[in-house]
Regions:
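Acidic-and-aromatic substrate-binding clefts and catalytic sites of carbohydrate-active enzymes
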Residues: 46-59, 77-84, 90-103, 129, ...
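Short, acidic/polar
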Residues: 51-65, 146-156, 218-229, 294-306
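Aromatic-lined carbohydrate-recognition surfaces of secreted/lumenal glycan-active proteins
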Residues: 120-132, 140, 164-171, 190-222, ...
């Protein structure tokens, strides 16, 4: 009987090992959060206007974010197309963008390596996504573009010590994907087509940032949407907190975080990834462009709400350069937010 049992066990192990695509390594999940979570430990960055930044300029920027406790930089996209921009920010042979800024990503990664900043690299984004969110043919074409960009990035930067993850820059939300079938189409024809290929290229985690609008979606709808979205081959699911875009008021924010948490970890019992907060540090009178840095009082409430959610393991901001950096185009308001934030974390660290 023991020999028979051993035979069964070995047979099952052999079957499971064969059932996995041998070219697909296990995705490398981020390490568990430290016992004491910091506040903002990462930020997004957009490469507009940074095409010709030198490594010294990247050093200055990354030193600044590191000085406020950040260790992660998410490049929102490395290729972008809209009526005003048609560009790739590395040495790419692709034919779906017109302009190539050949050295931008290389310089960023070189600086990040020196500064011990972990970089998650975003792929290609065509701004007509907002008109084609459930258009399968369009999604398949754009998935191919993202894969092409990823293959080139892997060939050029795959072994770089600062390169720690991938980011899919297409932001899904429950109002557009308002049925299980629509989420399935997005998952199977877009997210998984990309992420499955990424996991063949390397074992780095793949992330996405979902959002919602409280005037269009209830907490219950967000919960179910997050449960369905997290059936995708994703290791990091971020939730934009929506405060800067005026998608939610501060007094309702916790209820949506809690709903997202339930969707990821209770309704979907199979999600093995992590839950990050994407905290909006910008503001505007109507939640639309042009934006400017928010007040610290508002950001503090957003931070404390995110930190109250047990499964939120990391909080990243959108985004430090515009809203908090010394080089912000909104210098006075950015300086005020940054200095108030630095005083806040200094006090927190002293406790």
């Amino acid at each position: 009987m023991k020999k028979f049992s051993l035979f069964i066990i070995l047979s099952v192990m052999f079957f499971l090992s064969c059932s996995r695509d041998n070219n697909t390594p296990n995705p490398e999940l981020p390490p568990p959060p430290p016992l004491e979570r910091k506040i903002l430990t990462g930020t997004f960055v957009q490469l507009f206007g940074k095409d010709n930044w030198s490594e010294a300029q990247w050093d200055e920027f990354l030193t600044e974010i590191k000085d406020v406790g950040m260790n992660t930089l998410i490049v929102q996209y490395t290729a972008f197309k809209n009526p005003y921009n048609n560009i790739t920010w590395f040495n790419s042979a692709n034919t779906f963008t017109a302009t190539k800024s050949k050295n931008t990503l290389q310089r960023l990664l070189a600086s990040a390596g020196r500064k011990a900043i972990e970089v998650h690299i975003g792929l290609h984004f065509d701004d007509t996504y907002w008109h084609h969110q459930t258009d399968v043919a369009w999604l398949q074409t754009q998935a191919n573009h993202c894969i092409a960009i990823a293959e080139e990035i892997q060939a050029q930067f795959g072994t770089h010590t600062a390169f720690k993850g991938w980011y899919i820059p297409h932001e899904p939300e429950p109002n557009a994907y308002n049925t299980d079938e629509k989420v399935r189409l997005f998952r199977e024809h877009f997210v998984d087509r990309i992420s499955n290929r990424l996991h063949q290229l390397n074992n780095k985690p793949v992330s996405i940032a979902a959002f919602w609008n409280s005037s269009l979606s209830t907490p219950e709808q967000l919960q179910h949407f997050m449960a369905e979205l997290s059936k995708s081959n994703l290791q990091i699911v971020m939730l934009q907190d929506g405060v800067g875009a005026q998608h939610v008021t501060l007094n309702r924010l916790a209820s949506y975080y809690e709903a997202a948490q339930r969707g990821l970890f209770e309704e979907n019992k199979n999600y093995k990834g992590v839950f990050w907060s994407d905290l909006e540090t910008f503001a505007s009178p109507n939640g639309e462009y042009p934006f400017h840095p928010a007040t610290f009082d508002r950001v503090k409430q957003q931070l404390e709400t995110a930190l109250s959610i047990p499964k939120v393991s990391k909080i990243v901001s959108f985004h430090y350069f515009d809203d908090m950096s010394t080089k912000s185009p909104h210098k006075a308001k950015a300086d005020a937010l940054r200095e108030a934030y630095k005083n806040y974390i200094k006090h927190k660290n002293a406790l």
